[in-house]
């Protein structure tokens, strides 16, 4: 029965699958919070909107059960089985990366399931989930790569060549001198003279997330801003899915085409209905 329905409504099923894939793509490609870090320091990543009793999960990379690091349900569990990184799960639901190296450069995600009743004022209710993503970028000096403007310089080199030809005969001696031929070539060389970039002062420990100091991470958006952006993306995805379903379920493009043919040729065409 399902196969028969898909056969007769394959266009609708295809459009619906594309819309679902688009919604999933938006969900998994939210902009992550950028966290620059210096080799040998500690980095603290904070969960947002967390109360006692809420369920919090920390994972790295693409996430999933095999990459869990911390689990608060609400009892705290640290999972070091599938990771070679030194970290600690703090009692305030934060993740502490200890003595980071360049191998720590990765995505770190926190998923919070709201259980506490205090979330009802925000219309979240129970079992509502909030995802937050961080991208920790570890370098030797703790700064992001910057591009510098090159100032070219030009040097000129001139080469002069002179040719003299002398011809002599037996009866009459005639000396012929050709005109001096000078060839000048100019070659341009570019030399880069980049300006030296200044390295900002680093800190022993970097705190990121709700309540963190903004001076250490000037490029980092606030978690509240990411929360609003996630809501907006989901609303946009739902609206797009609804529009696509309405357009292709009621066959609006086909009906517009038939109306145009009727006005052009004066022929009444009856659209084929589904079986």
Swiss-Prot record:
Cellular location(s): Host cell membrane; Host endoplasmic reticulum
Membrane-spanning residues: 228-248
UniProt modification remark: Glycosylated.
Signal peptide location: 1-31
Composition bias type Low complexity, residue spans: 146-186
Glycosylated residue positions: 42, 84, 92, 99, 141
Taxonomic superkingdom: Viruses
Region feature (Disordered): 145-200
Annotated membrane topology: Single-pass type I membrane protein
GO cellular component entries: host cell endoplasmic reticulum; host cell plasma membrane; membrane
Keywords per UniProt: Glycoprotein, Host cell membrane, Host endoplasmic reticulum, Host membrane, Membrane, Signal, Transmembrane, Transmembrane helix
Cytoplasmic compartment residues: 249-275
UniProt main location, coarse: host cell
UniProt topological domain (Extracellular) ranges: 32-227
Function of the protein: Plays a role in the modulation of host immune response by modulating T-cell function. Interacts with host PTPRC/CD45 and thereby reduces host TCR signaling and T-cell proliferation.
Subunit note: Interacts with host PTPRC; this interaction affects T-cell signaling.
Family of this protein: Belongs to the RL11 family.
Protein name, per record: Protein UL11
Organism of derivation: Human cytomegalovirus (strain AD169) (HHV-5)
